[in-house]
Amino acid sequence: TGYFYEAVDGSKREFWESEKIDARAVEGTDKSIYQQIINEYGEDSDEARVEVYGDFPKSGQDQFIAPHLVDDAVARPLYKDPTAPVVVGVDPARGGMDSTVIVVRQGRDIVAIRRFKGEDTMAVVGHVIDAIDEYKPTLTVIDEGGLGYGILDRLTEQRYKVKGVNFGSKSKTPLMWGNKRAEMWGAMRDWLKTASIPLDRGLKNDLIGPTKKPDSKGTIFLEGKKEMKARGLASPDAADALAVTFAFPVA
C-alpha cells in the first residue's frame, strides 16, 4: 500500500510511466536462484511476486483485505441486476474527523456512497430517510454504536424497516470470527471477489486499512479504529458502512 503502490498499480497509475522487470530477464543474474524461490514458495506466492517478478505482494502479512481484491472489483463493470435486493448500510460518525457514511448495495454492485460530516442525530436520520425513499431497500442496517442507537430508535419509531448491529456482539461462527464486525468484514471480503465497486479512493483506503488480529486459538479479530488512528490511518467509515449490509440475510 502507500503512494508507490498507487503510482504503479493503483489509482495514480495513469499519471506515471512504470515498468515491472522480472529478475530472470536481467543480464548476469543466476536464474537458478529465482527458480528455486518459485519451486519453494509457489509461482503465485508473495515471495515469488516480489523477489522474482518485480511485482507487489498480494497483501501485507497481516492485511485483512488485499489491494488486488479491491482493484479487481473496481475494474469490473456494474452487474445492474434489478432483481437483487437493495440493502442500505449506515455507519454513524463518532465525532472528530470521522464521517457518517451511507452505502447502498444491490447484489454485487455498490449503487451509492454518501458522506456527511458534523451532522447531529436528526440530520443523519433525515439523510437515511432520503436514501430509503430513493432506493426502496429491502433492509436498512445501522451500526448502533455511538450516535447509531438514537438514529435507529428514531427510524424505528417512524416505522421504517431498520435493524441495528453491535460490532462487538457475538459472531454466528465464534471459532472463526471473534465478533460480529470481523464476521461482516469476512463476508464483505468474500463478496469483493466477484463484486463491482466504484473508483473511490476513500473506500479503497478504508477496505485495505485494517489488519487482522488472530488470538491464540486462531480466531480472527480486526484492528480497532483507535489502533488504526494510532498508525496514522483514518477510521474506515465507508468500509464499515458497506460491511453492515452483510450483517443479516436478505431474500
Language-model features and meaning:
Residues 3, 106-220:
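Mg2+-dependent endonuclease catalytic cores in nucleic-acid-processing enzymes, primarily RNase H-like
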Residues 1-7, 19-21, 39-60, 145, ...:
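ATP-hydrolysis module of ASCE/P-loop NTPase motor domains
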Residues 1-44, 109, 130-133, 149-161, ...:
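ASCE P-loop NTPase helicase motor core
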Residues 114-115, 204, 208-251:
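Acidic two-metal-ion nuclease catalytic site recognized across multiple nuclease folds
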Residues 103-105, 242:
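Conserved hydrophobic/aromatic positions in well-ordered beta-strands
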Residues 83, 94-101:
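Short, flexible loop/turn motifs enriched in small residues
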Residues 18-20, 87-89, 113, 162-164:
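Conserved beta-strand scaffold positions in the cores of enzyme catalytic domains, especially
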Residues 24-90, 104, 214-217:
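ATPase catalytic-site recognition across NTP-hydrolyzing enzymes
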